[in-house]
């Protein structure tokens, strides 16, 4: 009888402890945030990604009632910052502001984790990518590139930053239009600036730019935008057809979102998503994103954002099959 009573008491105590812990976690989630939030941006200061996250976060902190402190943590192909957040306490006070590079880094063999190592909070913006030629090139639109390659096998030069967004862009583009990668020359550059210089010098045939990197050159006629990798035409390039209008079934963008460490309570994720969603309703914020940074506001949270990430990673994985990351 004493043993039975002891077992019962132990069980009750254990259940009470579990209940107490659950109540404590719920209380913590309901009290969130209890301190300033650290937003790790795994890139250097001053770039479009850094500025966009800072801009939106300054507005989001009004809703949260605490400061969101951006921390630039560049290095190791943006994996230094992502790993730091991945290994942080899942209490909502350390976040990651990043984009497709999370999946790209795993596909390139740089790390062993991808989107599934985090809790997705919200997609915020997309910067639409644009295949581009110099103004003197005979190709007038993206649907002419495949024929041009077939007419000049092994001679056509496409620029890219190895293992980066544009590397995957061209792999996916070649797959969609039926270009064999053995028939083209992929020329690697360390950054976008050097690709701009190479296209200005006509050392390459094609590059992948967007409005932040190529807008001024599109406007003055130095570069020719060959299509827009987005379901709809861009306000900044109303006369440039989408790739889908040209018969190329692909969209491609740099999709920026906010992530939390795995295990962060849903209530906290919802609170953060709501704050960032409210920030994107501000007309000044939206105007700067669209007009200064050539990006589009696209807000997705919860299951919708998870579905977007799943589709994004599947498309990148398919493109990765055509990439030799060792060369």
Can you say where each PLM-predicted feature lies in the sequence?
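Short secondary-structure boundary segments
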Residues: 99-100, 135, 211-212, 230, ...
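Ligand-binding pocket segment of bilobal, Venus flytrap-like solute-binding proteins
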Residues: 160-162, 166-240
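Positively charged n-region of N-terminal signal peptides that target proteins for export
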Residues: 1-5
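Hinge/capping helix and adjacent helix->loop/strand transition within the periplasmic-binding protein
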Residues: 84-93, 107-194, 243, 248, ...
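Extracytoplasmic/secreted proteins, especially bacterial periplasmic and envelope-associated proteins
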Residues: 51, 55, 59, 63, ...
């Amino acid at each position: 009888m004493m043993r039975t009573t002891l077992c019962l008491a132990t069980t009750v105590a254990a259940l009470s402890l579990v209940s107490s812990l659950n109540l404590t976690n719920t209380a913590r989630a309901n009290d969130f945030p209890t301190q300033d939030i650290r937003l790790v941006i795994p890139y250097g200061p001053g770039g479009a990604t850094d500025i966009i996250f800072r801009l939106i976060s300054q507005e989001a902190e009004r809703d949260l009632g605490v400061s969101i402190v951006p921390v630039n943590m560049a290095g190791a192909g943006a994996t230094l910052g992502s790993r730091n957040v991945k290994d942080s306490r899942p209490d909502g006070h350390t976040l990651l502001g990043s984009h497709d590079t999370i999946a790209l880094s795993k596909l390139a063999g740089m790390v062993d984790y991808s989107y599934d190592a985090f809790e997705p909070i919200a997609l915020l913006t997309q910067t639409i990518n644009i295949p581009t030629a110099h103004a003197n090139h005979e190709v007038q639109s993206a649907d002419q590139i495949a024929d041009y390659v077939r007419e000049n096998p092994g001679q056509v030069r496409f620029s890219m930053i190895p293992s980066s967004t544009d590397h995957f862009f061209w792999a996916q583009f070649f797959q969609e239009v039926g270009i064999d990668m053995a028939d083209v020359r992929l020329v690697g550059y360390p950054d976008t600036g050097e690709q701009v210089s190479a296209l200005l010098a006509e050392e390459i045939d094609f590059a992948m730019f967007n409005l932040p990197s190529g807008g001024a050159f599109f406007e003055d006629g130095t570069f020719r935008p060959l299509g827009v990798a987005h379901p709809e035409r861009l306000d900044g390039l109303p006369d440039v057809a989408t790739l889908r209008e040209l018969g190329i079934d692909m969209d491609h963008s740099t999709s920026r979102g906010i992530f939390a460490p795995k295990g962060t309570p849903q209530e906290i994720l919802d609170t953060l998503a709501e704050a960032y969603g409210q920030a994107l309703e501000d007309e000044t914020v939206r105007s700067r994103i669209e007009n200064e940074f050539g990006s589009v506001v696209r807000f997705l949270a919860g299951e919708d954002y998870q579905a977007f990430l799943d589709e994004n990673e599947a498309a990148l994985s398919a493109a990765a099959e055509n990439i030799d990351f060792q060369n």
